[in-house]
Design a protein with these regions (language model features):
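Bacterial N-terminal signal peptides
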Residues: 7-18
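Positively charged n-region of N-terminal signal peptides that target proteins for export
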Residues: 1-4
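C-terminal and inter-domain tail/linker signature
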Residues: 22-163
Length: 163
């Protein structure tokens, strides 16, 4: 009887688990940017800082005149909406970005900055409209990955779809 009760309880738990397993934990930004930029590997720390400062100054700040400080001329772009090459990046973003004062920190809600070898990944909180509930939103993540070569951003990937 005891084994039956245990089996019955386990069956109930398994039957209810699909409802519990789909409850999302909201994605949270990490407020400690300096901790995310730190690394025991000097090369990883330098690569993280390069990408972080590029994001702050060029991407968020709209200062396209600083692109050559951060990006290789032969920059390879894997986002389907932006052509390859530093000049193409600058031309594209010059049309849509306005120069604003450069902030001391990345404004977008960062979850993590990860470096491995010549790659750096920025992970962000992304808030999206819930397709099942038009008045609701949910959080998810967005990733941008960069390859560094000769202390410049040489290549970029993200999850963008063609628009």
């Amino acid at each position: 009887m005891k084994q039956f009760a245990h089996s019955f309880a386990l069956a109930w738990a398994l039957a209810l688990s699909p409802f519990v397993a789909h409850a999302q934990v909201a994605v949270q930004a990490n407020p400690d940017h300096e901790q995310m930029l730190a690394s025991g590997d000097p090369r990883a720390a330098a690569n993280k800082r390069l990408v972080y400062d590029f994001w702050r100054e060029v991407f968020e700040g709209g200062h396209m005149e600083l692109a050559d400080k951060y990006m290789a001329e032969s920059y390879i772009q894997h986002n389907p909406n932006v052509a390859t090459g530093r000049a193409a990046f600058v031309a594209f973003f010059s049309r849509i970005a306005k120069s604003v004062p450069i902030e001391a920190r990345v404004k977008a809600p960062l979850v993590a900055v990860v470096a491995e070898g010549d790659r750096v990944i920025l992970c962000f909180v992304r808030t999206a409209k819930d397709p099942k509930e038009p008045t609701a939103t949910y959080t998810t993540t967005w990733f941008d990955m960069f390859r560094i070569e000769d202390a410049k951003i040489a290549e970029h990937w993200d999850g963008a779809a063609r628009s």
